[in-house]
A protein has these predicted regions:
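Alpha-helical scaffold segments that mediate packing/assembly in large oligomeric complexes
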Residues: 1-74
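Sequence/fold signature of self-assembling virion shell proteins
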Residues: 42-78, 91-94, 99-212
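Short gly/pro-enriched beta-turn/loop segments at secondary-structure junctions
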Residues: 83-92
Length: 212
């Protein structure tokens, strides 16, 4: 139970980055919200926000993947340098969805050779089948919003800082000579987890805030 609570705590902190400020995310050092549709040639522009539903084919995903592939690397956060870097040349490999969309995401991204056995319709070609990991985010309550993320091993977007590890520390005062046990037959447990979560970079992250 304590281990699951620790996992849910980490999940909650990361999920909140995508949903705070009505889905725009936190304000970055460049003055722009994490997710916005402003061009990169403008201060604070991240051009990583759309409003298209995930759908039942790859139209929406292709648009997001292409936009992320073309995003320019940071040269300098100063006038005259905005949006002048080289394209990052990376496509997303993770699709984050609420529980309401996980079936639709799996229908798009499970390996096509598994589709007959799993009774999942092959809605399109094998272009993305087996190349994208659909992940349901328990804390997301909006049934239509979704996000795309580049493999964090290639370019991390969210960073987790920890002391003593991500796994919670569990302390038990259950010895027969502990005061609580000796006096009151109580076995006391303390769970401790030191974490900090923040945005490392907007380039690997893209959000679709869908109306409805």
């Amino acid at each position: 139970e304590a281990a699951l609570a620790g996992i849910r705590n980490v999940s909650e902190q990361v999920a909140a980055i995508f949903t705070q400020a009505a889905g725009a995310g936190p304000t970055m050092n460049d003055g722009g919200a994490l997710f916005n549709s402003t061009a990169q040639t403008t201060a604070g522009g991240h051009i990583n926000l759309l409003t298209t539903a995930l759908g039942t084919d790859y139209t929406a995903w292709n648009a997001v993947a292409t936009a992320m592939y073309k995003k320019k690397l940071m040269v300098k956060n100063a006038a005259g340098y905005y949006g002048t870097g080289k394209p990052q040349g990376l496509k997303p490999s993770i699709c984050l969805v609420p529980a309401d969309l996980i079936a639709a995401a799996e229908a798009l991204f499970v390996p096509r050779w598994e589709a007959p056995a799993q009774n999942v319709p092959a809605t399109a070609s094998v272009r993305w089948g087996g190349r994208v990991d659909p992940i349901a985010v328990p804390e997301w309550t909006d049934a239509t919003d979704w996000a795309a993320v580049i493999d964090p091993k290639l370019r991390p977007g969210v960073m987790i800082g920890e002391i003593f590890g991500v796994v919670p520390q569990i302390f038990s005062a259950s010895s027969e000579i502990d005061p609580a046990m000796f006096a009151n037959d109580e076995s006391r447990i303390k769970v401790r987890q030191f974490l900090t979560v923040g945005v490392a970079d907007d380039l690997p992250l893209h959000k679709n805030n869908v109306a409805g």
